[in-house]
């Protein structure tokens, strides 16, 4: 294997195998777009398989699903930071969705803690959601207002679920997933990671 081949990411090599470049020989731009999209899908599939494979082997599947779904529920409208490198994204995902559930799986919470925590989360959604990135600026003030409103409604719905669920440990895991999303939209996180905040201002 050549040094060049060894340095090519696995996802890119798989995309090359799955897409016939000959079919796109008259449309190089189209080929690159399709290849990039396929690479993103392959990266996410491999990351998903790794995270949930480890969760399954370690007996943390339910805990991982709880934290992950809580995180995704709020992220749908509040957006937030993404890791800039695939390896970093994978490592962060393992820490968030495998290590954190392992650490907090037996930590119970009561409804007073739930109310206090989600009051803090709701405040952050009001102040900072939605948060964009350099690669995905959220353009349009009305669009951002709509996303903020939906993010806050989503937070209230998740609060209700956490209050009503009868398992004290599950309440904790829901809060952990939600707090991870709060971290990803907080401007302090952007500052610490030296990432640009309010990227839409560059286009408006």
Curated annotation (Swiss-Prot):
It is found in: Cell membrane. It comes from the Bacteria. Keywords: Cell membrane, Hydrolase, Membrane, Protease, Quorum sensing, Transmembrane, Transmembrane helix. Its main location: membrane. The keyword Transmembrane helix applies. May be involved in the proteolytic processing of a quorum sensing system signal molecule precursor. This is Putative AgrB-like protein. It comes from Listeria monocytogenes serotype 4a (strain HCC23).
